[in-house]
Curated annotation (Swiss-Prot):
One of its GO terms (biological process) is glutamine metabolic process. It catalyses: hydrogencarbonate + L-glutamine + 2 ATP + H2O = carbamoyl phosphate + L-glutamate + 2 ADP + phosphate + 2 H(+). It comes from Bacillus cereus (strain ATCC 10987 / NRS 248). It comes from the Bacteria. CDD domains: GATase1_CPSase. InterPro entries: Anth_synth/Amidotransfase, CarbamoylP_synth_ssu, CarbamoylP_synth_ssu_N, CarbP_synth_ssu_N_sf, Class_I_gatase-like, CPSase_GATase1, GATASE. Transmembrane segments: none annotated. This is Carbamoyl phosphate synthase small chain. SMART domains: CPSase_sm_chain (SM01097). L-glutamine binds at residues 45, 218, 220, 246, 249, 287, 289-290. The active site is at 245 (nucleophile), 330, 332. Its EC number is 6.3.5.5. Composed of two chains; the small (or glutamine) chain promotes the hydrolysis of glutamine to ammonia, which is used by the large (or ammonia) chain to synthesize carbamoyl phosphate. Tetramer of heterodimers (alpha,beta)4.
Length: 365
């Protein structure tokens, strides 16, 4: 079955279709990960996107029950050079092709993914549509140019609060499109977690008496989530806070900094990040199309703690007065390296220190 990818600039790439027999549009992006395709498909941060894998062979270990980052995949399509139809792994339960058919997600194989990746790197992220061979190219191009992708966070966030009980610190986890890996890391440390929707107010969060607040990852432009920015303006300084990815960007906006769209984003498992305090470099997992503008941090109460070595963009922030820090990358590493996993320990240490300071103030009052 032939299928084509039509880009908003008029480019047409023809290959072999697999997965769902449906036409879908989305923002065409690329990821450099050699593995972790199951986590990528189920990562809500990819909501509404058509993901191109730069590694030539995808699907060779199949799909299993353990590696999902959300219950429902949010991607709009998948592009690979070659798909493996006969996976071999002791955990394999279903092939990638069959999984995409079940979920009605279209795929395209047999195209030059290097050519597509170079185009995205040169011209920036492009809107595209996976469609059948009889599609009207001129009409599709005109529709793509007029399309605006918004409200992704609303689509992937939980609709109602729910608990993930533990005996340790109570952490309110604000879900902007949370990866399950973040929740797993908190559960591993016996945190008493309450997951809340993206539009939960500061008053509602504080009513839960949290010891700490965690801001999850999520898809799209942080400026599309004004409710969260207003919530954070009322929260910062009252409770220890740790943000990841979109949570990092929202924290920056609430603190007076600015964000902007990257030319083609950071997506992959091998992005080097430098800790400015220690000089150490961590290899990190990343997935974002927006970043905090470095110059916008200067007139705020934030300090830059980490930078990307590939392009110098801001990768970490800390508040100068209050117990709050954020990172642009994914310390939970699902999938990816675990170099930054100790940031969860730093968060819990910050909670403990904040509690001790409060107790000392009460004793001295």
């Amino acid at each position: 079955m032939k299928r084509q990818l039509i880009l908003e600039d008029g480019t047409v790439l023809i290959g072999t279709g697999f997965g769902g027999e449906i036409e879908k549009s989305g923002e065409v992006v690329f990821t450099t990960g050699m593995t972790g395709y199951q986590e990528t498909l189920s990562d809500p941060s990819y909501c509404g996107q058509i993901v191109t894998f730069t590694y030539p062979l995808i699907g060779n270990y199949g799909i299993n029950r353990d590696d999902f980052e959300s219950i429902h995949p949010s991607v709009n399509g998948l592009i690979v050079n070659e798909i493996c139809d006969h996976p071999s792994n002791f955990r394999n339960e279903i092939s990638l092709n069959d999984y995409l058919k079940e979920r009605n997600i279209p795929g395209l194989a047999g195209i030059d993914t290097r050519k597509l990746t170079r185009k995205i790197r040169q011209y920036g992220t492009l809107r595209g549509r996976l469609c059948n061979m009889d599609a009207d190219v001129e009409y599709i191009v005109s529709q793509l140019k007029a399309t605006v992708f918004t409200d992704h966070v609303k689509r992937v966030s939980t609709k109602d609060p729910y608990p993930s009980p533990g005996r340790g610190h109570r952490v309110v986890l604000v879900d902007f499109g949370m990866k399950h890996g973040i929740l797993r890391e908190l559960n591993k440390r016996d945190c008493d977690v309450i997951v809340v929707p993206y539009n939960t107010t500061a008053e509602e969060i504080l009513r839960l008496s949290p010891d700490g607040i965690m801001l999850s990852n999520g898809p799209g432009d942080p400026k599309d989530v004004p409710e969260a920015i207003e919530m954070l303006k009322d929260i910062i300084g009252k409770v220890p806070l740790f943000g990841i990815c979109l949570g990092h960007q929202l924290f920056a906006l609430a603190s007076g900094a600015n964000t902007s769209k990257l030319k083609f984003g950071h997506r992959g498992l091998n992005h080097p990040v430098k800790n400015l305090a220690t000089g150490k470099v961590a290899i990190t997992s990343q997935n974002h199309g927006y970043a905090v503008e470095e110059e916008s941090v200067e007139n705020t109460e934030l300090e830059i703690t980490h930078v990307a070595l590939n392009d110098g963009t801001v990768e970490g922030l800390r508040h100068k007065k209050f117990p709050a820090f954020t990172v642009q990358y994914h310390p939970e590493a699902s999938a990816g390296p675990e170099d930054a996993n100790d940031l969860f320990e730093d968060f819990l240490t910050m909670i403990e220190n904040f509690k001790k300071e409060g107790e000392e103030l009460c004793q001295n009052a």
